[in-house]
Amino acid sequence: VGELGIVSLGHVGSVLLFGDRPPDHMRDIAFPTDSSTSKRLLRWYLGEQGLDPRCIDLGPDLKSMLQQCDGALLIGDRALRAASEYPSLVQLDLGAEWTRTTGLPMVFGIFAAHRSADEELMVEARTELVANYRSFLRDQSRREEVVRLAAGKIGLTPDRMDQYFLSEVSNLLDEESVEGLSRF
């Protein structure tokens, strides 16, 4: 659907490796069952570091994952919430690691439609989504409302959610993001 995606600008805060030891001392890592991109990114990182821990697919619950493994990968709201609740267990931000290594943004997802989808409707949807996102960025009262709702839903402070939306993720793909996507 063109220029729409989920892009980290370095530190992403929502794709995190947790554990009570650094990654190079993890014998096994629990992977969530809800993200192929993040699992692939962690495998890339481990390969870059010459690490080969055993990787196990488990449900995305930090406590149960860490009862069974030295490390646990969490994404999305669960990662944001767990980082707030257990800051000492955060060992690695994968968005930051990708950008540090490649110098490029990390694209965690793109908005796509099946080839059989009506092209006119897809153009209309893309136009509307881009306009809404740009309005969110420009209109402070609208952003504050979204931030308040998201913070309440996830259980974080509005300041933390505002930082996440403005500094850590973007929903627009630019040339650099597309290059990062191609590299990945």
Question: Which residues does each predicted region cover?
Answer:
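Phosphate-rich cofactor/ligand-interacting catalytic cores and adjacent structured alpha/beta frameworks
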Residues: G5-S8, C69
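Small-molecule pocket liners
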Residues: H11-L17, M106-F111
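Short, basic, helix/turn surface patches
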Residues: V7-L16, A83-P87
